[in-house]
């Protein structure tokens, strides 16, 4: 029977749960990164023919930041103390991500990925297509190891995400032949191409931890906003980054006239003279790389594009933090996830 103490007991129970969560052992992102790499290194490839599976193993062995699996494990670790339990689904998402890179490299005819020869150059284009297709299936096979009760929501989310990423890639390709791409269209394209997989990884981690639906959804929104900030920062670093830190040559987007947030806004905000000069540099003519990158960067400086992009990054980062604030957990549970996203964005706090 209900008594005046009923509410009090309920509150005490809730507080004791929160207290337990506070005292749990949290893994650092560095520890989780090491676990992901060790797990990937030990994955067996026992099927034949070897020529189909060697490129898959090769692509996954090239390293990388492992952002998506680490985010999934950090998300799970908000509620549960055994992130090792979900290493296979975390690696499934990393397998899928690397499959998209394998096919991207083929579409771009890229020579290098993470300082190593790309699959279609090391083997050939047909191998890259077939191994890539198989890699997508392997990602599903690895994801299907999650417990039966959670399998349906996880597969539904992952499948929707995979479709969205394909849509984002197609939009990106379509934009190459258009001169009227708007800022909103560009933001939607990078949301689909980049953000949704970060969001998906975070939400799957929450689902597998048995988190409340509202918290899982808040983490998805957090990932979406952080993903937008992350991609815009990539655009910015392509122009203003240090090549040593950035890991690739500066000005790649400028050289191929890629419709980035920066170029779209430069055209929108340029005066007649600046627009004419931008159009000249973005025409099909062959230009000296150094000369073209310097000229377009100077135009960006004149128009104030760097500050504009930095403000937009700040906006999405702040929006993301608001969604993380909404996750109903003690603040100390979120410290590691906050620190990791700050590190992703190369921020001190």
Where are these regions (language model features)?
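All-alpha prenyltransferase/terpene-synthase fold signal
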Residues: 13-349
């Amino acid at each position: 029977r209900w008594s005046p103490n009923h509410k009090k007991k309920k509150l005490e129970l809730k507080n004791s749960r929160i207290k337990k969560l506070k005292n749990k052992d949290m893994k650092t992102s560095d520890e989780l990164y090491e676990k992901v790499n060790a797990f990937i290194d030990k994955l067996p490839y026992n099927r034949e023919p070897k020529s189909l599976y060697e490129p898959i193993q090769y692509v996954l062995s090239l390293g990388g930041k492992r952002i998506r699996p680490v985010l999934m494990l950090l998300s799970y670790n908000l509620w549960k103390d055994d992130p090792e339990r979900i290493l296979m689904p975390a690696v499934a998402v990393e397998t899928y991500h690397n499959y998209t890179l394998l096919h991207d490299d083929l579409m771009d005819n890229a020579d290098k990925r993470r300082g190593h020869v790309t699959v279609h150059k090391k083997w050939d284009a047909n191998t890259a297509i077939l191994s890539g297709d198989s890699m997508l299936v392997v990602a599903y096979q690895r994801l299907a190891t999650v417990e039966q009760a959670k399998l349906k929501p996880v597969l539904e989310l992952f499948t929707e995400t995979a479709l969205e990423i394909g849509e984002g890639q197609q939009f990106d390709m379509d934009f190459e032949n258009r001169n009227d791409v708007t800022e909103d269209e560009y933001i939607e394209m990078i949301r689909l191409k980049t953000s949704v997989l970060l969001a998906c990884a975070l939400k799957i981690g929450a689902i597998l931890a048995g988190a409340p639906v509202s918290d899982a959804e808040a983490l998805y929104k957090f990932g979406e906003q952080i993903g937008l900030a992350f991609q815009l920062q990539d655009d910015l670093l392509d122009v203003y980054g240090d090549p040593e830190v950035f890991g690739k040559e500066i000005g790649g987007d400028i050289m191929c006239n890629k419709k980035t947030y920066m170029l779209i806004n430069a055209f929108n905000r340029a005066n007649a003279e600046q627009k004419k000069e931008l159009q000249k540099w973005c025409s099909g003519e062959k230009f000296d790389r150094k000369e073209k990158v310097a000229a377009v960067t100077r135009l960006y400086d004149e128009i104030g594009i760097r500050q504009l992009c930095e403000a937009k990054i700040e906006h999405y980062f702040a929006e993301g933090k608001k969604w993380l604030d909404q996750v109903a957990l003690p603040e100390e549970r979120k410290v590691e996830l906050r620190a990791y996203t700050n590190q992703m964005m190369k921020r001190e706090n």
